[in-house]
Curated annotation (Swiss-Prot):
InterPro entries reported for this sequence: KOW (IPR005824), KOW_Spt5_1 (IPR041973), KOW_Spt5_2 (IPR041975), KOW_Spt5_3 (IPR041976), KOW_Spt5_4 (IPR041977), KOW_Spt5_5 (IPR041978), NGN-domain (IPR005100), NGN-like_dom (IPR006645)
Biased composition (Low complexity): 960-974
UniProt organism field: Schizosaccharomyces pombe (strain 972 / ATCC 24843)
Domain (KOW): residue spans on this chain: 471-498, 520-547, 727-754
PANTHER family tied to this protein: SUPPRESSOR OF TY 5 (PTHR11125), TRANSCRIPTION ELONGATION FACTOR SPT5 (PTHR11125:SF7)
Gene Ontology process terms (BP): mRNA processing; regulation of DNA-templated transcription elongation; regulation of transcription by RNA polymerase II; transcription elongation by RNA polymerase II; transcription elongation-coupled chromatin remodeling
Subunit structure: Component of the spt4-spt5 complex. Interacts with RNA polymerase II.
Role description: The spt4-spt5 complex mediates both activation and inhibition of transcription elongation, and plays a role in pre-mRNA processing. This complex seems to be important for the stability of the RNA polymerase II elongation machinery on the chromatin template but not for the inherent ability of this machinery to translocate down the gene.
Annotated Sequence repeat ranges: 818-826, 827-835, 836-844, 845-853, 854-862, 863-871, 872-880, 881-889, 890-898, 899-907, 908-916
Superkingdom, natural source: Eukaryota
Biased composition (Polar residues): 29-41, 52-74, 824-862
Skewed-composition ranges (Basic residues): 133-142
Start and end residues of each stretch annotated as Disordered: 1-176, 818-862, 946-990
Protein name: Transcription elongation factor spt5
Lineage, broadest ranks: Eukaryota, Fungi, Dikarya, Ascomycota, Taphrinomycotina
Amino acid sequence: MDTNSPKSIDKDANSTEVDAAEQDAASVKINSTRASPNGSDLLNDDSEAAKITTNEKQSSPVDSHNESPNDTTINKGEDGNENEVDNVNNNDKKEDEDNVEENEEEADANEEEEEDEEDDEEDEEDEDESGGGRRKRARHDRRNQFLDIEAEVDEDEEELEDEEDEIGREDGFIEEEVGADYVGDDRRHRELDRQRQELQSVDAERLAEEYREKYGRSQTVVGDTSNVPQRLLLPSVNDPNIWAVRCKIGKEKDIVFTIMRKAMDLQYTSSPLEIISAFQRDSLVGYIYVEARKQSHVLDALNGVLNVYTNNMILVPIKEMPDLLKVQKQVVELLPGAYVRIRRGKYAGDLAQVDNLSENGLTARVRIVPRIDYSDGLKRKNSATRPQARLFNESEAFKSNPSKFSKRGPRLFLFNNEEFEDGFLVKDIRISSLITEGVNPTLDEVSKFNPNNEDLDLSSLALSVKGGHAEFQPGDHVEVYVGEQTGVSGVVENVRGSVITMVSSDGLRLDVPSRGLRKRFRHGDYVKVIAGKYKDDTGMVVRISKDEVTFLSDTLMTELTVFSRDLGEASSAQAVNSAYELHDLVQLDVNTVACIFSVDRDTYKVIDQNGGVRTVLASQITMRHSNRRGVATDRNGAEIRIGDKVKEVGGEGKQGTILHIYRAFVFLHNRDIAENNGVFSARSRNVATIAAKGARISADLTKMNPALSNGPALPPVANLKRTIGRDKAIGATVRIRRGPMKGLLGVIKDTTDANARVELHTGNKMVTIPKENLLYTTKTGELISYTEFIERSRGIRPGSISTADGPNVPNWAQGARTPAVANGSRTPAWNTGSRTPAWNSGSKTPAWNSGSRTPAWNSGNKTPAWNAGSRTPAWNSGNKTPAWNVGNKTPAWNSGAKTPAWNAGNKTPSWNNGTKTPAWNANQTPMVANGTNTSWGQTPAYGGFSETNWDTEDNSKPYTAPTPGAWAAPTPGGWDDEEGDSPKYVPPSP
């Protein structure tokens, strides 16, 4: 039904109907708003009420000339009341037409008033909108999405009447008379009245409880959390548990980060981690802590995480949880001169001294003893070992890398983009990278920053030492050095925590805090170190400076400076360790000896024969050497003993007094050397005598004895023969037996015919040595010459004839050579078997009393002994008597007892015997040359022939040459192979 045409209506005639409709709509709207928080739901129960409320919100009064207050667009509702609404509108139209003319004048007058009121209302609405809060968004019924409940709005502005504004501002429910045509309002009103009565009948406490349950949890309180009682923050049995899980030391933070990443990855999956938190404490190494409801949740979170050991997890008790999570932040104020340590990097753990602080307090300029490898350019980078800490050396730095070296001042250098001043590395480091607590520097470390012990500030050192308060005992002599009573001294009477009760020298009892006291000592007191590096060391006080006490150590025999709080009075000066004393020579293992240079409470610091320094326990020492009469020779061959003052030849040139001598090593001591308390080791041949103990000036007689200095006498080396193929001496271990390098060991690397290239064990130096000057070491340790070494390598037995010289050339060192007048065992020798008799032996050939041998020519026709069956004549002669007509001569050639039988095999002699004596071409007996005898000639050959008969005298020289050097023992003459020729004997040469 279309009602868009504007109509002019009479206000008085239509006031009743319009006011009733407006009041009903306003009543429904107000009641629905004030009924309850869910009042909007009540209006949605009926579609018709929704239509009226919606049209009322979207419509406003318009100009009386253009639009009537009852001119409203209503869509078809769900209740089917369209016909009733049409009838009401038709009646209104008829009445309007009848009264149009009567109300024209009044409408014109009212039009101006309404415009003025409209302007005022617009101003008030603007003020309300600007001053009011944010408008609440209207709630819409989900069922209205299928209905057209919007009213058509005219182009002109609409405004509410004054009466409507007053109705909207009323607090109570205005009950107006409603016509019979307004259906459904009573039912809704009754429903609202019933709900109000129910709310009023409810008990106030019960209502408050309902509101508390409904809105209590969503309320938030804004306030200061510091006012919350601490007991409310303590964990209880309702809180999750904390599990301590063991892990690999140093991996605690990595494991916590791994768990965090795992939780983030599984957060939006079907199986997220069910743990609440995971954390670690730097002070509790080797553990991480996981907060969870169940232990299985912890195991699931740690599944697959490396370096975690979940076998024995520990449930942290509830009462220990606050201590575990408590963080006590201590702010340490750094001052210039304080000592700190580097946290990480190449200088991790090194001591540094604060030089200055930045303005923002985040960085500090520190001095560090540098660690520089000046040969780093020649080595591969990222070496596993870090260089030794020592002061900067500008000369070595310049030689190492001149391009990165520059001088900026007298003691200021720039090297490798790092600044060095007075030998120290000066560097700006963040304070977070420094360890400022528990530094505990030692005096040795501090002395590096004060090399001359000048201006040694132990007060700043005390600030860096953890637990800087002394431990006082009743009876200690103390002195007050802080506060109003500075300088007062006395004796401790009682100790109550940090409060010390002392009795002053005036007899007054004073209560002084322990931090203001220090122990007091006098010169000459025996003290004992009760804390620190030199704990349990004893000594006598020699110097006192404020809180610093210097005493002479009984074990180290040096002056040590410590804090007075670390000292206590000692009854005697006995050292704690008595098993071994300072400077004892001890045996560590089979090949290592060492000298003790420092004695601590449970350990010893020793230096071995190779210069290595180590710290050992008493159980690691095998024995103690007590050889006080050791003797050795120095570089010049002079005798050195314990107590002599010697000096190193080469190297650093250090000098000192000999403490011990062990084999080829000496242990020396020099009080002027601070390193290792002045103890060092060297080889005896690398030192030279400066002053001998007792002013010994006698020569070393051992060097004059060749048997002691050169070893056993060796025969001269024969001519070295050229070897074929690879020399067997290559790779052999040799010892030089003469020359400037005598006694050194080495290995042959290459050889020539006469020389060998030897790599010495000392210094790996390569030298060229003649082969005849070398002694070769066998597997048994025997030293042999080069010739014998080669022969043994070829399988030739020593003493046999060398095949290289042939069978005719004797070997001088062999006993079977022919002849040698100076050697009694050479040929001839009377008792050497079948050799020619010696020239001076009494048993000439044949001897006159040699049994049944061939009778001598002047033996008086003696017959061989009756029982000489095996003697000459021949072995098968049957003891025949010589021929009847031969006189004194040897029996006939064809007798059964020929001497020797021609076919007697190896009998003496036989012309065809391969081993004739002498052999025809081997080692012949020297012959007479030019009528004179020589001892070096060859043995006469067998090939001489007799020019006379057998019974005549033969004067041929080859057959009458006597044995060399023996004029009374002629050699038997040769015999011819012709018939009738037989051996014969001739008298000695005239």
